[in-house]
């Protein structure tokens, strides 16, 4: 049974509805899937129903923005029964993410007459385009040629994740466990592009001390060296070994990256604990 446990719907920044995600997964021959939208679980009800109707094995998930030392990282939470406290953490993280766009426009409106916070707050976009409000607003107001180029503007104006009150990894893991779920580090290759494997292992050991449950070892941009490092660490410490292609639908960046099912991994090649 082929597995892909990292994909997004239009409830965060993907371009597909939850039902369309499940239908595409079935067409691609996947058997075990999860929608892990950024800081929201709005897709869960539709996703669960679609999986049941189409006979797909599934696990409910969410991708949380977190702080890990000096890094901004993502945690994938799976198989949890959300309680009031964890729901509040998810909601707060979503608010922090949205606030980044508000703060960017507050800065930029001082330099440009044709944009304003009031204009931004009243702005809407077609969520089927994927992405998120801030980058679509910048594109529609003429600041970028391509929607994704808006990310650079956030950086140029120093609107960084590290400036916002996202939960720490330790806090997130604690609440995921209270809810009976599993906490998995998403796409380490995005944080450790220029790191040695020794540096990676050092951070993994810190995560282990925080009771992380697994690592997304198989991911489109991972090098063979990093993949092997992740797998070995998980095997050595009895952690989950997961796979995710991070499909955002039409927002997927390149032909061979971030396409649903682009990494072919059978359930028997992984180590899953749900």
List the predicted regions and their residue ranges.
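Charged catalytic cores and adjacent phosphate/nucleic-acid-binding surfaces used
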Residues: 1-9, 15-28, 41-83, 171-185, ...
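Mid-domain alpha/beta scaffold segments of enzyme catalytic cores
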Residues: 20, 31, 38-103, 107, ...
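Hydrophobic, aromatic-enriched interface-forming segments
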Residues: 111-173
């Amino acid at each position: 049974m082929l597995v892909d446990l990292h994909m997004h719907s239009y409830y965060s920044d993907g371009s597909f509805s939850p039902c369309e995600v499940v239908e595409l997964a079935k067409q691609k021959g996947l058997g075990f899937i999860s929608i892990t939208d950024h800081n929201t679980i709005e897709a869960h009800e539709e996703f669960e129903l679609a999986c049941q109707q189409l006979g797909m094995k599934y696990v409910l998930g969410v991708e949380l923005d977190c702080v890990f030392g000096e890094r901004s990282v993502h945690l994938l939470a799976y198989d949890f029964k959300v309680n009031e406290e964890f729901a509040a953490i998810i909601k707060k993280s979503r608010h922090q993410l949205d606030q980044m766009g508000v703060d960017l426009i507050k800065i930029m409106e001082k330099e440009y007459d044709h944009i304003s916070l009031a204009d931004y707050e009243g702005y809407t976009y077609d969520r089927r385009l994927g992405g998120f409000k801030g980058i679509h607003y910048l594109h529609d107001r003429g600041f970028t040629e391509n929607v994704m180029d808006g990310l650079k503007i956030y950086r140029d104006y120093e609107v960084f994740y590290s400036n916002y009150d996202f939960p720490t990894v330790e806090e997130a893991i604690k609440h995921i466990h209270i809810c009976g779920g599993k906490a998995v580090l998403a796409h380490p290759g995005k944080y450790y592009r220029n790191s040695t494997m020794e540096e990676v292992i050092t951070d993994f050991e810190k995560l282990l001390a925080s009771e992380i449950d697994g690592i997304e070892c198989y991911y489109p941009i991972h090098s063979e060296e990093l993949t092997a490092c992740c797998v070995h660490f998980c095997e050595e410490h009895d952690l989950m070994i997961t796979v995710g292609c991070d499909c955002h639908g039409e927002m997927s960046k390149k032909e061979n990256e971030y396409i649903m099912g682009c990494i072919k991994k059978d359930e028997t090649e992984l180590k899953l604990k749900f």
